[in-house]
Amino acid sequence: MGRSLMKGNEAMAAAAIAAGCKCFFGYPITPQNEIPEFMSKVMYESGGKFVQAESEVAAINMVYGAGGAGVRAMTSSSSPGIALKQEGISYLAGAEIPAVILNVMRGGPGLGSIQPAQSDYNMMTHGGGDGDYKCPVLAPANLQEAADMIMEAFDMADYYRTPVYVAADGFIGQMMEPVEIIYKPKYELKEKTWAANGTRGKREKNIVNSLYLEPELLYEHNIHLQEKYNKIKEKEARAENYYTDDADVILVSYGTMSRVVRGVVDTFRAEGKKVGMIRPQTLWPFPVKAFNNPNCKLYVSIEMSMGQMIDDIKLAIECKVPVKFFGKAGGLVPAAYEIIEHVREFAGGIL
């Protein structure tokens, strides 16, 4: 299949089907409505199942059921809808059920607006539900990467037995770009012998849940989860480093925002200013190793939120140099000229 001009939401939905998604459960909410609309037709054509659930809560619990039976299952929503799913996502993590959760983010808090934003960073990376759990969070910056990350998310979910987020936003969902959808398995996956998919008289029944009434057993389960998360942190964290080798000032941004910041870096470089960019491609695990930049004297987090990524940057650099923030929330996007003005102000005599 060659490259096709596609809308982001449809490209991500098509990528899910290419990766073998057999069950999609969703509920309408802007700006991701094209995804369930697309799935309602194409999922049946591909031999899968589509259900428009009665609520976001119902949808995530349907994912729990399908994933627990060993089927590749997915849901999509946007910020307030993802918030409603948090209990179910905690259950998925606790029961170690693979699932893909696509969040096409919009402005908040509350109902907020339907405009693009990045204000769900904390909810996704630091666990919005109860308990000590983590979910891998993949953050695409263009439609090709969005489609690729959707396909990768299914493999990652199966390999680690965990729910996986793909953190897009309204821009990624609504823009159109050329995309080529080719599914290439990333991991060597094993048969799901743990799944509750029927004994067929050949084995003992499997029980898939997150309930441990004995404190010692629950503690052991939590230790097991943390060991798994440590493996994910070691193997899966990644970022794009753009002109960071000699940079005095490094801007940090992800997703759609990084497209603007890349142009800002190019502007500074044209002036002979040593400015670079780190673009986290995984929000969790956060790409700590990408921040090993001994020349850097200042980091600036540029976000479509009110600074939710700053603390992770400070932890990554162990607060050795200053970290500043510039961003906008509620659906507004920092313009290149605004970023340039703030970086000059923050940098002072550094640049």
Go through each PLM region and give its residues.
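Generic long, charged, amphipathic alpha-helical segments
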Residues: 261-292
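Conserved thiamine diphosphate
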Residues: 115-165, 169
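Peripheral docking tails and interdomain loops at the edges
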Residues: 304-351
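Glycine-/acidic-rich phosphate or pyrophosphate-binding loops and their flanking alpha/beta elements
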Residues: 7-11, 227-249, 262
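Short beta-strand segments
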Residues: 100-105, 138-140, 165-169, 302-303, ...
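Conformationally flexible catalytic loops at phosphate/diphosphate-handling active centers
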Residues: 161-241
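Thiamine diphosphate
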Residues: 1-127, 134, 142, 329, ...
